[in-house]
Amino acid sequence: MNSVIMESIVMGLIFSILTIGVVITFKILDFPDMSVEGTFPLGAFAFAKMLTLGMNPVLAMVVSLAAGGLGGYITYILFRKFKIQAILAGILTMTFLYSVNLRITGTPNVTFFDYKTIFQLFESLPKMLILAIITLVIKLILDWFLKTEKGYLLLATGDNETLVKSLGKNPDKYIAIGLVISNALAALAGALMAQSNGYADITMGQAIIVSALASVIIGDAFLKNANFLNRTTRAIIGAIIYRIIYGIAL
């Protein structure tokens, strides 16, 4: 039982990064972005490609982050420039990225057990601690960003686009920023998941949006009276609780 809980916490920490990204689109921007189901495996495949080319795993994760952000921007282009509904724009991006992911490595799955991942790079540290540090850094950076002018305008865009326009700002810019950040985090989570598993698989993004939304709901439900916890903290705790419940149920 202890091993199940420990492994569930590890998975929860990985999924918490994805969940934080989903909070930005679904809760802050009220944008039903489905493209994370494409950018999650995109991050894994981009990482796998860079790693097998001999790139340092940390730099490979940065590439994954950038690839995911680009995927999010594609969704924005489809939504705003081509006037496609939000949910359909995300589905189109997800479908497009399925083909992209296959082309990156030329195979639906790729293993890299013979390559050094971030967990081998810092092998003196437990996997859980490495993931906890990464998650904490992301949380702190995002919390800081949301307190900046751009962060406040991102929050305002989700609440009232008219208000943002009255301030002389373009809400489209902040929708784009939100989608880029959200999908970049999804891709980073995918890269970490691939490293944890030792392989990337084309199906690893299927239904992850359901898991992420369930994590958000659980975090809000369990901690609805904990006003001292902000949205990113609740997302992290919700993801961990969800994975523990999921692990025990299996």
What is each residue range found by the language model?
Residues V22, M55-T95, V100, L136, ...:
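Alpha-helical transmembrane segments within multi-pass membrane transporters and channels
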Residues T25-G43, F82-L92, L153, I177, ...:
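Short, non-helical or kinked segments that cap or interrupt transmembrane helices
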Residues S3-G54, M61, L78-K81, I217-K224:
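Single transmembrane alpha-helix segments in multi-pass membrane proteins
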Residues I24, K49, Y73, I77-F82, ...:
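Membrane-interface helix caps of multi-pass small-molecule transporters
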Residues A186, G190, S196-L250:
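Transmembrane alpha-helical segments in multi-pass inner-membrane proteins
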